[in-house]
Each structure stands twice: as structure tokens, then as C-alpha cells.
A protein has these predicted regions:
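Long, highly charged, low-complexity intrinsically disordered interaction regions
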Residues: 1-3
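Short beta-strand scaffold segments in enzyme catalytic cores
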Residues: 60-64, 141-142
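Short HxH-centered metal-ligating active-site micro-motif
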Residues: 79-120
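Divalent-metal-activated hydrolytic enzyme cores
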Residues: 126-142
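Long, charged amphipathic helices and adjacent flexible linkers at domain junctions
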Residues: 24, 28-48
Length: 142
């Protein structure tokens, strides 16, 4: 016994419902296809925009890529305070070595809305680049 009259969903209605669920899953995970190919900063911006927009704290992610720049995995490395997140090279590079990533990209937000890199941002980037070079990762900092 049902709650109301039974209605069948036709092919078009079923396809629309399936598409709606797919969009909901994509929005809920806040990311594009996990195997997305990263071609540049725009792809990263789209991948993290929704998650960073609502964040009240600084969040630092590492995105691990294969040889064709497809996402193998992404990891939240650190969640900090309003204006800082502690990041150590071993927390970023260790997983890259374990999963045999060809390369990686790191991203973080500025909850203040000011996109200008801080002195600490430059220092962390420099430490990560130096540690990465010693392990065979090429730096592509621009």
C-alpha cells in the first residue's frame, strides 16, 4: 500500500531525474570529475571555488596528478585559523611519493578575500619547491 497514487516515470523524466542527481552529487562534493585534467589555474579555481567561498578558515589542499595532469587524488593537508594554516613539506610530498604521482599542485584560500600572497605564503612555497626538487619534482612556480 502506497502513500499516494502510483505513477511511472517515463524515459525523459527518468533521464532528467538521473541528471538532477548527478548534478547534486557534483555540487555536494564541490569538485569536478576526480580524474579531471588540470590545464591551468582556471581549472583549479573551478575545482575549489565553492569549497573556498564558504570557508571561514584557511584550508590548504594538495592535488596529486598523473603524467597527463589528471587528478589522481586530492587531500586536505591543513585547516588553520582565519589567516594561517600550518603546512610541512612531508605532509604534502609524502603522499605524492606513496601514490607515485608525477606532479602535484597546492592551493589554499584566503578567507579575508584578499588574494595577495603573504610573506608566509612565499616562504611555504619556497620550502615546498626546494623539498620537491630534492625528490625529483619539477617546480613550475610562476
Amino acid at each position: 500500500m502506497g502513500i499516494g497514487p502510483s505513477r511511472k516515470v517515463g524515459d525523459r523524466g527518468g533521464a532528467a531525474l538521473k541528471a538532477s542527481f548527478a548534478l547534486s552529487r557534483r555540487a555536494a562534493r564541490g569538485a569536478l570529475d576526480p580524474n579531471q585534467r588540470i590545464r591551468g589555474g582556471g581549472d583549479l579555481f573551478e575545482r575549489f571555488r565553492e569549497r573556498f567561498a564558504a570557508a571561514q578558515k584557511e584550508i590548504f589542499f594538495a592535488v596529486y596528478l598523473d603524467g597527463r595532469n589528471r587528478v589522481v587524488r586530492e587531500e586536505r593537508v591543513s585547516e588553520g585559523t582565519l589567516n594561517a594554516a600550518i603546512v610541512h613539506p612531508r605532509e604534502v610530498l609524502g603522499p605524492a611519493l606513496r601514490m607515485c604521482a608525477a606532479s602535484l599542485v597546492v592551493v589554499h584560500n584566503h578567507p579575508s578575500g584578499d588574494p595577495a600572497p603573504s610573506a608566509e605564503d612565499f616562504a611555504v612555497t619556497r620550502r615546498l619547491a626546494e623539498a620537491g626538487r630534492s625528490l625529483g619534482f619539477r617546480s613550475s612556480i610562476t
